[in-house]
Curated annotation (Swiss-Prot):
It comes from Tolumonas auensis (strain DSM 9187 / NBRC 110442 / TA 4). This is Negative modulator of initiation of replication. Its main location: cytoplasm. One of its GO terms (molecular function) is DNA binding. Negative regulator of replication initiation, which contributes to regulation of DNA replication and ensures that replication initiation occurs exactly once per chromosome per cell cycle. Binds to pairs of hemimethylated GATC sequences in the oriC region, thus preventing assembly of replication proteins and re-initiation at newly replicated origins. Repression is relieved when the region becomes fully methylated. It is found in: Cytoplasm. The gene is seqA.
Length: 170
């Protein structure tokens, strides 16, 4: 296996073409370029192997996000918050769906339509999370945004170290 460097736009394009968790960049490119499949199967073999593979892939997606120049150049905490939420969804859509049930004392954080968020508070300023079916409240301070990310990642099963690293990027 060789390593190549690609710019952020190309990386995002490749990542956005992922069909399933565990699909490698090589598999995606082979599919996009209509090249023959690799002789080694890349399909998940079982539940245990699949869980390990999911952790590895989702950690890779987040690690790439943390190193991403786009995240670093974003001046707004809301923009960084949205990039992180989008990456979390792309890394584990099913886990994100289950974890999106988290809520604060007085309001829900995520919904599939903005009205549900507005029904829980007229000042929530719901915004769509890019590349997901979800909306999130944005009228919160940076500390609350970090708490939302932390609770979401805990519910998704991420390690405490990775959670802390991601939260520090908001």
């Amino acid at each position: 296996m060789k390593t190549i460097e690609v710019d952020d736009q190309i990386y995002r394009y490749i990542a956005s073409r992922t069909l399933h968790i565990g699909e490698s960049a090589s598999d995606i490119l082979r599919r996009l370029l209509a090249l023959p499949l690799d002789t080694e199967p890349t399909v998940a073999l079982g539940h245990e192997a699949n869980a390990e593979q999911t952790d590895e892939v989702s950690t890779d997606v987040l690690t790439m996000l943390l190193d991403n120049a786009q995240l670093a150049k974003e001046e707004s905490a809301i923009a960084r918050f949205m990039l992180i939420l989008s990456a979390l969804y792309r890394s584990q859509p099913d886990a994100f769906r289950h974890a999106a049930d988290i809520k604060g004392r007085k309001r829900i954080y995520f919904a599939e339509d903005p009205q549900a968020l507005l029904d829980n508070g007229k000042t929530t300023k719901p915004k769509p999370v890019p590349e997901t079916p979800y909306w999130v409240i944005t009228n919160t301070n940076t500390g609350r945004k970090r708490l939302i990310i932390e609770q979401l990642m805990q519910a998704m099963g991420y390690s405490a170290d990775l959670i802390a690293e991601v939260c520090n990027k908001v």
